[in-house]
Amino acid sequence: MSEDRQGRSGDSNKILYCSFCGKSQHEVRKLIAGPSVFICDECVELCNDIIREELEEKAQSARSSLPKPREILEVLDQYVIGQLRAKRTLAVAVYNHYKRIESRSKNDDVELAKSNILLVGPTGSGKTLLAETLARLLNVPFTIADATTLTEAGYVGEDVENIIQKLLQKCDYDVEKAQQGIVYIDEIDKISRKSENPSITRDVSGEGVQQALLKLIEGTVASVPPQGGRKHPQQEFLQVDTKNILFICGGAFAGLDKVIQQRSNDAGGIGFGAKVKSSERKQEVGKILAEVEPEDLIKFGLIPEFVGRLPVVATLEELDEPALIKILTEPKNAITKQFKKLFDMEGVELEFRADALSAIAKKALKRKTGARGLRTIVESVLLDTMYELPSQENVSKVVVDESVIEHKSEPYLIYQAQPAPAKAASGD
């Protein structure tokens, strides 16, 4: 290349030098020409080394920024009350998942298998919040999919590939970011087959969806339409490799406790050697779910292949009244803290009495909505006050007690004391 440039310049005896290190064309193996500059092969190699070192430093920084399981648990504790066992299971599983991604980049001899997660717990026990908090902590793209809207390809409804498209939308169609994101699939128990006989129960929104999700969860290259794909059909589909995407599936699995109990009872046997079943030994649902085995999930209606793709199972307990009261007051995003902030922006103090918090928790337990129903209850009792308050003057405090939660009275408004009018001076 340098000889061609010499020929064009008309000066065949001119010696060319590297613009970076100053070596002549005779001192190096190759001299590459650019617009009025030259670079030798040695400088190219040096540039490659510099770039390689910077990439390794970035990778090392990413490794050091990955929080340890204990640090993950500490953050989860700030947002999710209770569920210690589930939080520990998640912390370890997520930490190992991202370590696995690092090991793949090193071309290690040992290949680590992917460990997706199944969350089993009652409605409102914190499954979705756990997944959201994890994604926020790790600063990775996160999306939630509803399993009940998914159908097999070719039928009316959402294809499973739509999940990956939602994940891409969350990171502005950055494929590299999406490939290390987290997907939470909710209501996974609703796609269970209704019988253990697959030949008569296969349907487009049940077992069929489980089959469609298998490859996606295990790791495959999904073809996803680009941004505005229908408007620009000539664009090529984006190829997203799902092998490093962490899938967390969650569901209430109503009735699973009975399946577990049935297995335990069958294991007890019959006859004189059988264990005596007593009503006093009746366990709480949360403790029963903690004993779940893969065979129980299969009997419930998940196909064996799907259960095998979710090796990490974390069970959540049903929240009791003390736990719900803590949820109302302790987390960073506690509901009472949020409403106090809203009232504070109006210059008004909001107070929840202890009996009010207890009444809110009892009402949520009665509705069987768990923590999810707490906000609805608080919204309903404060709606009229929040409507009237901006138009009222001199209100300094709003007090909510049990009678307000039971709709027996309105929130108590406390007004600022008006300054006494100044007396006019009496004339002599």
Swiss-Prot record:
Q: Which Gene Ontology terms of cellular component type are present?
A: HslUV protease complex
* Keyword match Zinc: yes
Q: Name one GO biological process term.
A: proteolysis involved in protein catabolic process
For the keyword Zinc, the answer is yes
Q: Where is the ClpX-type ZB domain?
A: 6-59
Kindly list the positions annotated as binding ATP. Answer: P122, T123, G124, S125, G126, K127, T128, L129
* SMART domains assigned to the protein according to its UniProt record, in alphabetical order: AAA (SM00382), ClpB_D2-small (SM01086), zf-C4_ClpX (SM00994)
Q: Cite the GO molecular-function annotations of the record.
A: ATP binding; ATP hydrolysis activity; ATP-dependent protein folding chaperone; protein dimerization activity; unfolded protein binding; zinc ion binding
InterPro entries, sorted: AAA+_ATPase (IPR003593), ATP-dep_Clp_protease_ClpX (IPR050052), ATPase_AAA_core (IPR003959), Clp_ATPase_C (IPR019489), Clp_protease_ATP-bd_su_ClpX (IPR004487), ClpX_bact (IPR046425), P-loop_NTPase (IPR027417), Znf_CppX_C4 (IPR010603)
- State one Pfam family annotation: ClpB_D2-small
**Source superkingdom:** Bacteria
The function of this protein is:
ATP-dependent specificity component of the Clp protease. It directs the protease to specific substrates. Can perform chaperone functions in the absence of ClpP.
> Which HAMAP family does the entry link to?
ClpX
- How is this protein named in the record? ATP-dependent Clp protease ATP-binding subunit ClpX
Question: Which species?
Answer: Xanthomonas oryzae pv. oryzae (strain KACC10331 / KXO85)
Gene name for this UniProt entry: clpX
